[in-house]
Structure formats: C-alpha cells, structure tokens
Amino acid sequence: MADKYDVFDQLGELENTLNTTLTQISGIRQVLEASMTENATLRMELEKLRDRLAEFEKKEVKKETPKDQPNPNLIQIFNEGFHICHLHYAERLAEGESCLDCLELLYR
C-alpha cells in the first residue's frame, strides 16, 4: 500500500512541476508577444522615417541644382546691347555682335 501512496505523491509533485513550467511558458509567451508587437511597430516607424529622409534628400538635391534660367538682370542688360562678361563688362555690343563669353555666362 505504501507504494501506491508514493505513486500518488510523485504524481502530485509532477503536477506541481508541470504547473510551474506551464506558468513559466505562459510568461515567456507574453514577453515574446510584447517583443514581437514592439518590433513590428518599430519596423513601421523605421520605414516611415526612411521615406521622410528620402523625401528630404530629394528636396536637398533640388535646392543644390543650378538654376535653369540665368539672372533676369543680366538678361536685361545683355538684351539692351551691353556686355555682361568680365572682359568687356558694360561695353556696348556692336550691331549684330554676339559675345561667347557673355552667352556662356548667361547659359552656364
């Protein structure tokens, strides 16, 4: 009979051990779920930040590109018949003359 009680005692101890293990597994699962949720949130935030950075970098590149149009004041002076180049600045252009230096300055 004593052996039967020993078996019941061992089953009781095993049940307690299994309950403790199950509680530990449940705790680990909760921590893992929280970590996975946080990871997903951080990944989405990182992607949004990368998109914003890419937009910002595109804007910076656009700011750094030279203007397609020359300075309107220089165009006006040149159209009035004056040199705008460094060599002959403010000298009158001869009739029908075009100065390559002036044109280069305008369309640089």
Swiss-Prot record:
It holds the Pfam family YabA. NCBIfam families: PRK13169.1-3. The gene is yabA. This is Replication initiation control protein YabA. It is found in: Cytoplasm, Nucleoid. Keywords: Cytoplasm, DNA replication, DNA replication inhibitor, Metal-binding, Zinc. Zn(2+) binds at H83, C85, C99, C102. Involved in control of chromosome replication initiation. Inhibits the cooperative binding of DnaA to the oriC region, thus negatively regulating initiation of chromosome replication. Inhibits the ability of DnaA-ATP to form a helix on DNA; does not disassemble preformed DnaA-DNA helices. Decreases the residence time of DnaA on the chromosome at its binding sites (oriC, replication forks and promoter-binding sites). Tethers DnaA to the replication machinery via the DNA polymerase beta sliding clamp subunit (dnaN). The keyword Phosphoprotein does not apply. Binds 1 zinc ion per subunit. One of its GO terms (biological process) is DNA replication. Its cofactor is Zn(2+). Belongs to the YabA family. The keyword Nucleus does not apply. One of its GO terms (cellular component) is nucleoid. Signal peptide: none annotated. Homotetramer. Interacts with both DnaA and DnaN, acting as a bridge between these two proteins. Disulfide bonds: none annotated. HAMAP family: YabA (MF_01159). Its main location: cytoplasm. InterPro entries: YabA.
